[in-house]
Amino acid sequence: VKDYVKIAYPGTDTLYVPATQLDLVSKYTGGGEEKPVKLSKMGGSDWVKTRSRAKSAAKDMAKKLIALYAERQRLPGHAFAPDSEWQREFEDNFGYTETDDQLRSIAEIKRDMEASVPMDRLLCGDVGFGKTEVALRAVMKCVLSGKQAAILVPTTVLAQQHYQTALQRFFGFPVNIAVMSRFKTGNQASKVLSDLATGKCDLVIGTHRLLSKDVKFKDLGLLVVDEEQRFGVTHKEKLKELSRQVDTLTLSATPIPRTLNMALSGIRDMSTIEVPPVDRQPVQTYVLEHNWGVIADAIRRELARGGQVYYMHNRVETIDRCAAQLRKLLGEEISIGVAHGKMDEKGLSSVMQQLSDGEIQVLVCTTIIETGIDIPNVNTLIIEDADRLGLAQLHQIRGRIGRSARRAYAYMTYRAGKILTEVAAKRLTAIREYAEFGSGFRIAMRDLEIRGAGNLLGPEQSGYMMSVGYDMYLQLLEEAVLEQRGEKAPQRTECSADLTVSANLPESYISSGEQRMDIYRRIAALRTAEQSQELLDELIDRYGEPPPPVLRLMDVALLRAEAMQIGVCDIAQRGSEISFTFAGADAVPVNAVMALCSLPKNRRRLTLSATGTEPKLLLRLTPNEDALDTALTLVGDLRVNKEENEKEVTL
């Protein structure tokens, strides 16, 4: 019994792909949920041309990245001193236990700072995973070396938030901190400018106001940029000038996919925080029709435990009316505030401060809370018209709650009686199901990762990424980077295996079609016995002891993997004979094959057929001999012989 995936092309063309080769098939993901995808005709030239254009763009991108990296390596930088006693004391004052990811990221950043070339590191981590603490430790290292540090943020609200966090974190240490934003009066701004120029100010936190011509530093040593992609083109150009010879740390809550990280390894330094802080609980998420009774109960339940609430109404024109309705519903004794991006500076600053101080119990707001707001006491979130927001945005907004050990609740609502589009329904299902940290959560992160890849590579490359799909583009970029470095991209010899053996995932073992497809793909992508054992352990943990067809399926995957290493592109059984076809005459490991054919046990049943362009090794099976086990043994012996011959040639 074998399973196949049926792929339909325009017209009546159909392709059946064996489940054992599902590693060759990936779902098209281009980052645009609603954008229709134009299908290529089977055997046509459209796809070849599109892929060629994307490959050329990836090559240009690789050249540009390598040139930028080489230029930065030539610039003189400041080598910061190793950690001092004060640095250790500052880090010991952290009120939480660091995760391994945080500690590793901190060590990588310090190593960069102590080097004599300017640091250019990207720190990626989900909302609430502790990037700010990592950045503040880098700031402390900079200040203790007698230099100034700047933290650049996209919004005024976030500048105030970081300022408050820094004041608390550096309390008791001789660090002079200032904030530069539109909340400042003329006199206050002049004082900050003067302190920066004279060196009195050690750390300044601000919006793009920091990029203005009148901002002069006495001795800037570290620039921390939070959510760089939110800045405009002009600001980014000014940022490049400012960061040329100072250590730069960029923070991103949009995850950069591991595959892209690997493709750019050695070109763009990246640190990732993938694990949530200790004691952090996933947010309990509900998707439901908007119902004032349910909402009132949810708010009262949060207020009863001393917490606060975000109520997101994303229309500025009607936000005051919404707040009035909540007052009527909850009673005048409940303190309700309003926050949106069109408010004047003082008004918005005052509201956010009142919320932080606990004076406002329910904040009716727009998506202004999406970036950086960190108030651990707000642990219930209600979103109106959640079906209008993208998965990435919903995830970011939900990340504003659940920032303490207390359980948090999110209510994603849509209008009563509204029939959701298929896309919106899928999005809301994903945000509900993937609240957990872990494997399911990573599936929901797919949309975020595509956005992260687009942010890192720029809008032009995002277009090419959409034309061929996310996975294919990353493969092309990785190959282009290796080529630009003068390294050879690994040649992929694909191998099909068609043996008379029952190898499949029975429905009785994994009932969900979607999960079966995912496991099929993961099994087909196995390359080593260690990977196979890890996946087997996971299967046992999730579904119980696997039946024989599942184990045979994993053996077929390992057979394909070993066969690829020795240049075999097809394994096929016809009755009592198995043929191993090589990908051309050059692919045949002649010495290894001849050594195997000359063994007494193989003399009558193993022959090399060199006719045609694709040489074949033919193996005759004895009665009752297991085809899969025999094929595994033969391919394993060939690989060992080939490796030994290569060692002898090297010596």
Describe each PLM feature range.
Residues 158-195, 329-330:
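Conserved helix-turn-beta segment of the N-terminal RecA-like "Helicase ATP-binding" lobe
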Residues 1-103, 494:
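Upstream accessory/linker segments immediately N-terminal to the RecA-like ATPase cores of bacterial MutS
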Residues 120, 134-163, 171-175:
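Conserved SF1/SF2 helicase motif Ia
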Residues 75, 292-310, 314, 318-571, ...:
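C-terminal helicase module of SF1/SF2 nucleic-acid helicases/translocases
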Residues 183-204, 212-220, 344-362:
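Conserved motor-coupling elements within RecA-like helicase/translocase cores
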Residues 147-149, 176, 199-203, 219-222, ...:
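Loop/turn-to-beta-strand initiation segments
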Residues 95-119, 133:
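N-terminal pre-P-loop "Q-motif" helix
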Residues 217-222, 228-306:
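Post-DEXD/H (motif II) to motif III coupling segment of the RecA-like Helicase ATP-binding lobe
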